[in-house]
Design a protein with these regions (language model features):
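ATP-dependent carboxylate/acyl-activation modules
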Residues: 1-78, 102-104, 108-132, 138-148
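Short glycine-rich, acidic/polar surface loops and turns
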Residues: 55, 90-91
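A short helix->loop->beta-strand "cap" motif at the edges of active sites that frequently abuts
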Residues: 94-102
Length: 148
């Protein structure tokens, strides 16, 4: 909040920063697609990332969007290859002439996880994603990209 004062979310720390429509957010927003509103009748995005990926593409194609921040979670019970479809979505955004977008993420997982963190990193980096060492690092970089 020191870098970007008005960040809205469907799960904000401050209730006055609740986003009006999480499927069609405006301004600087962080949307948690694992929140109850998105998982009623569907699997969590760690298991089925299709809603998150579709929303990421939709939002990244908007002309006012410059930075997309996300995380990838690995481990037992998670999607078998979460970065494969995600990398394709990001390549499609860049192919649509949106080269001026920054995609940043962190990976929560290990090389020993069934999805192999090294493999996930390679897939994302090959799509043009800046893969950070932690979610706090990714958020810090995203904030600095937005204000420059």
């Amino acid at each position: 909040s020191e870098i970007i004062p008005d960040v809205y979310s469907n799960a904000p720390l401050d209730p006055k920063h609740v986003v009006a429509d999480a499927l069609n957010p405006e301004g600087h927003c962080l949307i948690d697609y694992g929140e109850d509103a998105f998982t009623q009748g569907r699997l969590h995005p760690m298991i089925d990332p299709s809603l998150r990926n579709a929303q990421m593409k939709k939002q990244a194609l908007r002309p006012e969007v410059g930075v997309v921040l996300f995380d990838v979670v690995l481990g037992f019970g998670c999607h078998e290859n979460p970065s494969e479809e995600l990398a394709q979505v990001i390549k499609e955004v860049y192919a649509a002439g949106k080269e001026n977008r920054y995609f940043l993420c962190s990976i929560t997982g290990l090389d020993e996880d069934p999805q192999d963190a090294r493999k996930q990193r390679q897939l994302l980096e090959s799509a043009g994603v800046i893969v950070c060492g932690s979610n706090s690092e990714a958020a810090y970089i995203a904030g600095n990209l937005i204000v420059r």
